[in-house]
Regions:
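C-terminal alpha-helical interaction appendages
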Residues: 1-72
Length: 72
């Protein structure tokens, strides 16, 4: 598994690569990369106050939760 910092790097790289015609929101990118990296945590967060897929205003809360609970 990857570290939290590696996760953030992957989020940033993925976000940058999806800024063409079909732009992704940052929260959407976090959740997509989380699904690939830690599906169990994605399912736990999905639909909660920490789900930033559709709401970028929760990105900071989501990242703080993930950093606190990261398993490596």
């Amino acid at each position: 598994m990857i570290t939290f910092n590696e996760f953030l790097r992957k989020v940033d790289e993925t976000f940058a690569s999806h800024q063409g015609k079909n732009k992704w929101r940052y929260g959407q990118t976090i959740m997509n990369v989380l699904w690939q990296t830690w599906p169990q945590k994605y399912k736990e967060i999905q639909g909660s106050d920490f789900d930033c897929f559709y709401d970028n205003s929760t990105v900071r809360l989501t990242l703080a939760k993930l950093e606190k609970e990261w398993y490596i």
